[in-house]
């Protein structure tokens, strides 16, 4: 099956991932980067795994509502994982944000498979995750896409995903801290041009934003490299999603601003 065959142009609202409803609680504190204490509705306090190593600028609100996934396993120390946080949105109302950085690659893959990006990427035959590339093949690209025979552009597509949760007003920003890894990814994306296509996908894990820009305030060098990459031909596709207790749905592409 070709990914994205015969999908309608407007797919806004299409659920891409559906799961058992998450458990709601109140965030007490986040500490040691990977841990968060959350009080559940019955008053029980649980420690959840926080799969987000960054500062979580603008989305860390002790006393605010959060959603956790319960998945006990002998392989894992903690049975709970922090998935979503409720934050003040751009229009003054509350907005749910996806904070689990392990999710965006799955989400973008699901969007491609559903045909959400067919207009931008063309028809795709295969999607391979975590393929070695770059200098001395020491990096791994998030997704390597192969076009179908009918795709007018026959080049491979190197696609890098960035979980984006920070915003100012209605503009989503990445990064929210200095990221040498992110800088390196931009350089390596430029390196696959022009023989292959290079695509940067900011995964906008909140639905109150209408544009994306590099977070120059947090990492000026990233901003410089972002604009350099854009000028060199790296395609920027900010994908927006709505996060709910039992599903995540496609909200369409957002515009790109070279600067906020």
Kindly label every feature range from the protein language model.
Residues 54-67:
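Short nucleic-acid-contacting surface segments enriched for D/E, G, S/T with interspersed K/R
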Residues 32-37:
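Short aromatic-glycine-enriched beta-strand elements
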Residues 168-183, 187-218, 240-242:
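Nucleic-acid nuclease catalytic cores
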């Amino acid at each position: 099956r070709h990914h994205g065959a015969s999908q309608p142009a407007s797919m806004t609202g299409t659920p891409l991932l559906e799961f058992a409803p998450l458990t709601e609680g109140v965030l007490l504190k986040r500490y040691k980067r990977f841990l968060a204490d959350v009080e559940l509705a019955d008053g029980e306090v649980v420690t959840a795994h926080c799969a987000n190593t960054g500062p979580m600028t603008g989305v860390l609100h002790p006393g605010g509502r959060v959603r956790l996934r319960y998945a006990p396993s002998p392989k894992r120390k903690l049975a709970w994982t922090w998935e979503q946080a409720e934050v003040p949105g751009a229009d003054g109302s509350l907005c749910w944000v996806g904070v689990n950085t392990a999710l965006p690659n799955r989400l973008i893959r699901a969007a491609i498979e559903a045909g959400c990006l067919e207009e931008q990427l063309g028809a795709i035959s295969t999607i391979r995750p975590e393929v070695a590339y770059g200098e001395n093949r020491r990096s791994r690209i998030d997704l390597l896409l192969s076009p179908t025979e009918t795709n007018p552009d026959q080049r491979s597509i190197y696609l890098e995903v960035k979980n984006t949760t920070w915003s100012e007003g209605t503009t989503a920003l990445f990064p929210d801290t200095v990221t040498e890894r992110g800088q390196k990814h931009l350089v390596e994306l430029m390196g696959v041009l022009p023989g292959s296509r290079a695509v940067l996908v900011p995964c906008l894990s909140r639905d109150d934003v209408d544009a994306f820009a590099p977070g120059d305030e947090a990492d000026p060098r990233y901003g410089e490299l972002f604009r350099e990459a854009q000028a060199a031909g790296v395609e920027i596709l900010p994908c927006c999603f709505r996060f709910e207790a039992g599903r995540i749905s496609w909200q369409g592409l957002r515009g790109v601003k070279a600067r906020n």
